[in-house]
Amino acid sequence: FDAVEPASSEAVLKAQLSNSTLPVIGGVAIPSVAINLPIFKGLSNEALLYGAGTLSPTQKMGEGNYALASHRAQSPDLLFTPLDDVAIGATIYITDLENIYTYTATSTVRVQPTDVYLLDEVAGRKMITLITCGEMGGVTRRVVQGDLESVTPVADATDEMRAAFNMEQRTF
């Protein structure tokens, strides 16, 4: 996280003008709060302005503690800002474009940036961890965690799953 810059106007302009191609590896959607974002490999500033980035280069969807981060924005509906409104029991979908992994939110907390234990693997648990700044300026972190409920091939996706990934993507 040390190399990640706050979501400033300068950072947005720099990302919009950069020629970098972002490595899209999938998507994350939380219908109850209208989150639908691409997932990029890694935590570059550009990735966090246009979607969610993976915290570990070796993590795999549906295994262990799959962790994603994205920016908080001034606008309440951009990027991971809506994580504040995720309720326990909410459905969280991620996809690697081959399967859709369905998680159920089990906790939502605000923690200190040093509380990295939330990224640890938990024996026997397949989970997701979603992280954003707790407020503009990043004094704390908002963390939503959930447990894996099912894995569905994309070809067998339900109408609800398809609708989640067809929602508007709200990024910079």
Question: What is each PLM-predicted segment?
Answer:
Residues F1-F172:
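Solvent-exposed, non-transmembrane regions of membrane-associated and secreted proteins
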